[in-house]
């Protein structure tokens, strides 16, 4: 009788151990497989409305509305393609100073998102500094009726835009890239240049209200800006993505199915003279190439 009790006790212990082992095995087998599916690398996406994808829907759920973060901006696309865990703090209207100070209520400094565990930083920034973009497009559109075949915008602005690029924007972007590198010493930093807004030569009024002679002026300012960003990248070890050659022929004057920039009129886009979804995909493709080289 005593032996039978002992055997029963041993059998019960064995059953308990087997069940417990099964629980341990089940957890060990399943939990790591769940963890393995989580993106391990961390990407931070910074920048202005060109980076946030302003005007291109759908917007990111839960993001600050004023920042106009599109779920198909190039940072979002790169993260999805490469399985990065993304922190997107890009925001419409951002200057380089927006890396260091809050831009809107509830929107902190973008640089706060960059941490030592960051593996990749993608950004496009500088075009808003010194009100470069808004002044250039705003003034050129305002004065266009006064001399449609001439260059009234160049006559009014003169060298002010290029001086702003040289004196303010280039050093600001360079410092920003240095500060990003300090915060994320192991990260790859990829900064994109701005795609062309207008064609090489004649304008396309009324879609783009810029005088014929000012087309070259606007392109010249853009070229100077992109050159400044490239120099800043070279000086800091960041990777510059040149969109000039890629975007040639995809400007706001191109056909609907070709353009990457939405024109001032004749479009359903909520934000004009900015990249559309095709433009954001082209930016993501260019960043992909940079990451692969």
Describe these PLM feature segments:
Residues 1-27:
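Secretory targeting and sorting signals
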Residues 195-293:
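Catalytic His-Asp segment of secreted/periplasmic serine-dependent ester chemistry enzymes
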Residues 54, 104-165:
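Oxyanion-hole/transition-state-stabilizing segment in secreted/luminal serine hydrolases
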Residues 120-123, 146-181, 190, 194-240:
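Conserved N-terminal glycine/acidic-rich loop preference
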Residues 94-111, 253-267:
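Charged, often glycine-rich, active-site loop that binds/positions anionic groups
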Residues 42-45, 51, 86-90, 119-124, ...:
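Structural recognition of the beta-strand scaffold that forms the well-ordered cores
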Residues 27-44, 103-122, 173-188, 288-291:
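Short amphipathic alpha-helices and their capping/turn segments at secondary-structure boundaries
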Residues 29-92, 111, 140-146:
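Serine-esterase "nucleophile elbow" of acetyl-processing enzymes
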């Amino acid at each position: 009788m005593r032996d039978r009790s002992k055997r029963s006790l041993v059998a019960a212990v064995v059953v308990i151990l087997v069940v417990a082992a099964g629980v341990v095995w089940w957890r060990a087998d399943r939990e790591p497989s769940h963890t393995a599916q989580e993106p391990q690398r961390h990407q931070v996406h910074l920048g202005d409305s060109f980076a946030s994808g302003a005007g291109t829907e759908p917007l990111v759920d839960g993001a600050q509305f004023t920042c106009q973060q599109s779920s198909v901006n190039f940072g979002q696309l790169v993260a999805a393609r490469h399985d990065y865990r993304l922190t997107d703090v890009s925001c419409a209207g951002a200057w380089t100073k927006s890396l260091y100070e809050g831009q809107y209520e509830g929107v902190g400094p973008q640089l706060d998102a960059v941490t030592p565990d960051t593996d990749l930083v993608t950004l496009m920034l500088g075009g808003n500094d010194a009100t470069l973009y808004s002044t250039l497009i705003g003034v050129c559109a305002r004065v266009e009726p006064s001399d449609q075949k001439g260059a009234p915008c160049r006559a009014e602005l003169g060298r002010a835009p290029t001086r702003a690029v040289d004196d303010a924007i280039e050093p600001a972007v360079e410092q920003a890239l240095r500060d990003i590198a300090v915060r994320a010493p192991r990260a790859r930093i990829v900064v994109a240049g701005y795609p062309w807004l207008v064609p090489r030569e004649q304008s396309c009024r009324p879609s783009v209200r810029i005088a014929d002679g000012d087309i070259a002026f606007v392109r010249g300012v853009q070229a100077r800006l992109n050159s400044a960003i490239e120099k800043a990248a070279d000086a800091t070890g960041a990777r510059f993505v040149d969109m000039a050659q890629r975007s040639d022929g995809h400007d706001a004057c191109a056909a609907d199915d070709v353009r990457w920039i939405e024109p001032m009129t004749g479009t359903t886009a909520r934000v004009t003279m900015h990249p559309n979804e095709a433009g954001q995909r082209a930016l993501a493709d260019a960043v992909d190439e940079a990451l692969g080289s």
